[in-house]
């Protein structure tokens, strides 16, 4: 297998096309890229660049707030709010022995679910309202607009993924109804040059769910591990998102798609800002390899799991806020 030493670029402009030949080309690119490196830059995604710029502005404004102000909306049991530095550790990492917390802080929101939402009425894990800082004008509106736009884009991408996996797009979409979705506004302080190797902005890990769409600034620091175990830089490219697949999609695809390890090391000497959006299965989904992905040459590799319980375990392991909650 040839070594991949750069992140490929995929043009998804055809995702809105009815032209079968154009969709077929995109499907083939998805199959190849996410069966090998598992990361790509997306171009022609049709997300307004002004919306992305406004999102980063609101992120900057949030992280400039006094610590005491941000702590008014500290991360709660619904996994929403402010995550202070030194409170998140990738203890379950399969790719490094992680003992130190990530050197980042963030704001996180999820799908808004009020009292009359069916998920809240059923008592679904993490269902509930978001926490919002009241000090920043337009914060909620900007984040909600971006969140909604990214949700719609991921729904379209899921249709292409279903075709790539040989399964029915409508049936596959039902596994995300409604989806579990997260938007994080991350700030990574610069790590001094003499910092020990076990200190990361974000320790080596794979993502939990299905699709991650990352908007990042020009600072750099994101690295992706290729099949040979080498770390590849993923620098900023204007008007792109970096898309990677997570553990649930690797399971659904029976290993045909890879959930690739990645990390952040911010030795730039300046702050790094990034805004990842996570699109994951419905919290009650049962995730097991699709029949279309099980063959004589690719026998079943994974058992069925409950996504919500898997996510609960990961959050309890990785976040101080959840590790102090009742795990029974």
Residue ranges and their predicted role:
Residues 1-328:
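Peripheral, non-catalytic segments flanking oxidoreductase cores
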């Amino acid at each position: 297998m040839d070594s991949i030493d750069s992140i490929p670029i995929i043009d998804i402009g055809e995702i809105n096309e009815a032209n079968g030949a154009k969709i077929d080309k995109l499907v083939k690119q998805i199959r190849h890229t996410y069966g090998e490196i598992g990361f790509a830059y997306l171009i022609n995604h049709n997300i307004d660049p002004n919306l992305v710029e406004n999102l980063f502005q609101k992120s900057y404004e949030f992280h400039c707030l006094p610590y005491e102000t941000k702590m008014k909306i500290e991360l709660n049991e619904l996994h929403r709010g402010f995550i202070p530095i030194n409170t998140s550790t990738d203890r379950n990492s399969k790719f490094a022995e992680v003992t130190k917390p990530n050197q980042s802080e963030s704001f996180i929101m999820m799908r808004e679910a009020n009292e009359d939402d069916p998920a809240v009425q059923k008592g679904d894990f993490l269902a509930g309202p978001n926490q919002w800082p009241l000090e920043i004008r337009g914060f909620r509106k900007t984040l909600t607009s971006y969140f909604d736009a990214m949700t719609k884009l991921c729904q379209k991408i899921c249709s292409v993924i279903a075709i790539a996996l040989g399964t029915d797009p409508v049936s596959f979409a039902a596994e995300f109804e409604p989806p579990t979705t997260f938007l994080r506004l991350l700030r990574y302080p610069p790590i001094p040059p003499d910092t020990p190797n076990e200190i990361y902005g974000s320790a080596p890990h794979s993502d939990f769910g299905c699709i991650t769409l990352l908007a990042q600034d020009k600072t750099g620091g994101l690295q992706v591990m290729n099949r040979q175990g080498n770390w590849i830089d993923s620098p900023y490219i204007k008007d792109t998102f970096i898309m990677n697949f997570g553990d649930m999609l690797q399971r659904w695809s029976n290993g045909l798609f890879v959930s690739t390890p990645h990390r952040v090391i911010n030795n730039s000497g300046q702050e790094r800002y990034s805004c990842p959006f996570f699109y994951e299965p419905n919290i009650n989904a049962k995730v097991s390899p699709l029949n279309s992905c099980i063959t004589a040459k690719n026998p079943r590799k994974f058992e069925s799991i409950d996504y919500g319980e898997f996510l609960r375990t990961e959050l309890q392991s990785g976040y101080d806020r959840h590790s102090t909650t009742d795990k029974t």
